[in-house]
């Protein structure tokens, strides 16, 4: 198997003073935080990994493989994610995996899961990641129901520090949720799962509508283009609400109610007032131009209360939780001067949904709901065209669909992880319309929430397709994309024994160029042409759980470097975002849907069982006419 190793780019070794200078300046003071520099380099020696790791337990499962806790020969605990290439459905999934590896290996932050090594051979990709021993934040809050304000501030500061660092490097996460926020042995935050992340550019819009329903911003649920950071800001508002109040801010039991609440910024009235309510209101502003940015959050007085410095700088909390100098008071005064805009006129109406939607006599306190990521469509609609198209014709032929509800109840026990699918995205950057005042037309709304699946692990979440391989029948997902524009299915023969799929130059700009043209996929060095289906060397069921590394040999590679301003693909079309009101077409675009046998053929009596269908039908009409 080939391995991707994270080695520094060759060149002159910087002095100790040069290395210490950016670290002393801190993340916030540095205009562009340093990212790890890596280059693709092929090693010609093999690596046998069987004796390097001792597998201990399974942390998560996905369609592509598993995530296992393992111990290196040095004694260090790691999380090993194995991806079987024969499970990769198409090139979009492949590009999705590669993007996650490239972005996560380029980011270097204490509160972001680090990738140590990536190994690859003809049948597997093995990613060795940092191990977070205390699980995810969802389980942590589930066990405690509600955190103290001091603990909530501690977690939120670390989350903000990591997301702020990503935004300074033009990376938007787009899937911030409790399930993707892990805790290490020391109780520190580790953000995982960058499968839906992307690069963004000021002056360009992203056309990808993805994420998780209860954390999705108004732009996402209404199908409007967005720059990028504002969707993370909204998700941070939802996370802060949960950390402070211990409940979800929006009602996820009915997708119509959820869309209405998010669109109006009408979150539940908190059961108990908190000093963080002002920041929550600012983060949950419907208007993205008035929504708090990560810079605003990092300098907010509530976030920095009890700390000598703001988020990202050298932190030294004081005893008793009160600032020991005038720095916090000065920061608060500065924030009050900058935020003199009327927060109560932001359109985020704090409505009491306990009174409006609570069942009579029942408990109205909502619990947390585990979220699955939104899927991405196989092909992106042209945003420039959709912004000027008339949506009346689109909505006229879409039949209604009954509401799809999530199960009610408080926090559920953790079960085996099942990853949700995502499809890789076409280029999603589009220029801002010439007339900024012209609002984009609303897109046809479709269902948001679907049947829930098993819980996800932060190690195994967004990049994985659903267990069944269905495109439109997975749980807790938005599905968007015009079926008529979907690509024809790839020959399954392309999925067998593909070599070196992570060995391309690895530039983000290359990804968009490759996917813009119709190509097959296999090795990223040289995409293989289609070939007929060949029998696998052994059936998939014969692969043992402990055979992730087995006795195979691995080649070792370096990860690609990060290029500035690379155009990336989008992941979901605009046309199909907020609902699922029309049945998917059965054309060639629906290649990932599970085949289902026609129920008529299995019924006790069906016209398909008759020899003369026309005669039987006419006889039935005559009987009906006599009865009437």
Swiss-Prot record:
Stress-activated kinase involved in tolerance to glucose starvation. Induces cell-cell detachment by increasing F-actin conversion to G-actin. Expression is induced by CD95 or TNF-alpha, via NF-kappa-B. Protects cells from CD95-mediated apoptosis and is required for the increased motility and invasiveness of CD95-activated tumor cells. Phosphorylates LATS1 and LATS2. Plays a key role in neural tube closure during embryonic development through LATS2 phosphorylation and regulation of the nuclear localization of YAP1 a critical downstream regulatory target in the Hippo signaling pathway. It is an enzyme of class 2 (transferase). The keyword ATP-binding applies. Changing residue 208 to A: Prevents phosphorylation and activation by STK11/LKB1 complex. This is NUAK family SNF1-like kinase 2. It comes from Homo sapiens. Its EC number is 2.7.11.1. One of its GO terms (biological process) is actin cytoskeleton organization. Its cofactor is Mg(2+). Residues 355-493, 531-562 are annotated as: Disordered. SUPFAM superfamilies: Protein kinase-like (PK-like) (SSF56112). Residues 53-303 form the Protein kinase domain. Changing residue 503 to R: In an ovarian Endometrioid carcinoma sample; somatic mutation. Signal peptide: none annotated. Residues 457-469 have a biased composition (Low complexity). The modification Phosphoserine is found at residues 435, 523, 544, 547, 573. PANTHER family: MAP/MICROTUBULE AFFINITY-REGULATING KINASE (PTHR24346), NUAK FAMILY SNF1-LIKE KINASE 1 (PTHR24346:SF93). Keywords: Acetylation, Apoptosis, ATP-binding, Disease variant, Kinase, Magnesium, Metal-binding, Nucleotide-binding, Phosphoprotein, Serine/threonine-protein kinase, Transferase. The gene is NUAK2. Belongs to the protein kinase superfamily. CAMK Ser/Thr protein kinase family. SNF1 subfamily. The modification N-acetylmethionine is found at residue 1. One of its GO terms (molecular function) is protein serine kinase activity. Activated by phosphorylation on Thr-208. It catalyses: L-seryl-[protein] + ATP = O-phospho-L-seryl-[protein] + ADP + H(+); L-threonyl-[protein] + ATP = O-phospho-L-threonyl-[protein] + ADP + H(+).
């Amino acid at each position: 198997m080939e391995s991707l190793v994270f080695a520094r780019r060759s060149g002159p070794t910087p002095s100790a003073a040069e290395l210490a200078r950016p670290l002393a300046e801190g993340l916030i003071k540095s205009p562009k935080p340093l990212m790890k520099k890596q280059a693709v380099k092929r090693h010609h020696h093999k690596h046998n990994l069987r004796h390097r790791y001792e597998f201990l337990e399974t942390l998560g499962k996905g369609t592509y493989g598993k995530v296992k806790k393992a111990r290196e020969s040095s004694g260090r605990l790691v999380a090993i994610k194995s991806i079987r290439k024969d499970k990769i459905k198409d090139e979009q999934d492949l590009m999705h995996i590669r993007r996650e590896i490239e972005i996560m290996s380029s980011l270097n932050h204490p509160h972001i899961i680090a990738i140590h090594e990536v190994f690859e051979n003809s049948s597997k990709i093995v990613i060795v990641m940092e191990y977070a021993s205390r699980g995810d934040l969802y389980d942590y809050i589930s066990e405690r129901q509600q955190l103290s304000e001091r603990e909530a501030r501690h977690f939120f500061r670390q989350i903000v520090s990591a997301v702020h660092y990503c935004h300074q490097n033009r990376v938007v996460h787009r899937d911030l949720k409790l399930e993707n926020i892990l805790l290490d042995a020391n109780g520190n935050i580790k953000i995982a799962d960058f499968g839906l992340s992307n690069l963004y550019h000021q002056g360009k819009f992203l056309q990808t509508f993805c994420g998780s329903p209860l954390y999705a911003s108004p732009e996402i649920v209404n199908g409007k283009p967005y720059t990028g950071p504002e969707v993370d800001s909204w998700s941070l508002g939802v996370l802060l609400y949960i950390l402070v109040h211990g409940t979800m801010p929006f009602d996820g039991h009915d997708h119509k109610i959820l869309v209405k609440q998010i669109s109006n910024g009408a979150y539940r009235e908190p059961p108990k007032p908190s000093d963080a309510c002002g920041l929550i209101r600012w983060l949950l502003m419907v208007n993205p131009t008035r929504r708090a940015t990560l810079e605003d959050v990092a300098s907010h007085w509530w976030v920095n209360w009890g700390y000598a410095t703001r988020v990202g700088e050298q932190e030294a909390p004081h005893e008793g939780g009160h600032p020991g100098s005038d720095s916090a008071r000065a920061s608060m005064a500065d924030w009050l001067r900058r935020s003199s805009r009327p927060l109560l006129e932001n359109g985020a109406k704090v409505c009491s949904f306990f009174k409006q939607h609570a069942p009579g006599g029942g408990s109205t306190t909502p619990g947390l709901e585990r979220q699955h990521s939104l899927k991405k469509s196989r092909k992106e609609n042209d945003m420039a065209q959709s912004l000027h198209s008339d949506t009346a014709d689109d909505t006229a032929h879409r039949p209604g669909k009954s509401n799809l509800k999530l199960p009610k109840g408080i926090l559920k026990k953790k079960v085996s992880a099942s990853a949700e699918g995502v499809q890789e995205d076409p280029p999603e950057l589009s220029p801002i319309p010439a007339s900024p005042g012209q609002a984009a037309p609303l897109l046809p709304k479709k269902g948001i929430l679907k049947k829930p699946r098993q819980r996800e692990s932060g190690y195994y979440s967004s990049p994985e397709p659903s267990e069944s391989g269905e495109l439109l029948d997975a749980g807790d997902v938005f599905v968007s994309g015009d079926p008529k524009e979907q690509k024809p299915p790839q020959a399954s023969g392309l999925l067998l024994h593909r070599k070196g799929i992570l060995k391309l130059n690895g530039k983000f700009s290359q990804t968009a160029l490759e996917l813009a043209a119709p190509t097959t996929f296999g090795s990223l060095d040289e995409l293989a042409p289609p070939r007929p289906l060949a029998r696998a060397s052994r059936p998939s069921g014969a692969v043992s759980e402990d055979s992730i590394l087995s006795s195979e040999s691995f080649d070792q590679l370096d990860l690609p470097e990060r290029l500035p301003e690379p155009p990336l693909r989008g992941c979901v079309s605009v046309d199909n975002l907020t609902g699922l009101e029309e049945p998917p077409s059965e054309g060639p675009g629906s290649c990932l849907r599970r085949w289902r046998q026609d129920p008529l053929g299995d019924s006790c009596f069906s016209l398909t069982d008759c020899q003369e269908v026309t005669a039987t039908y006419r006889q039935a009409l005559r009987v009906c006419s006599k009865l009437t």
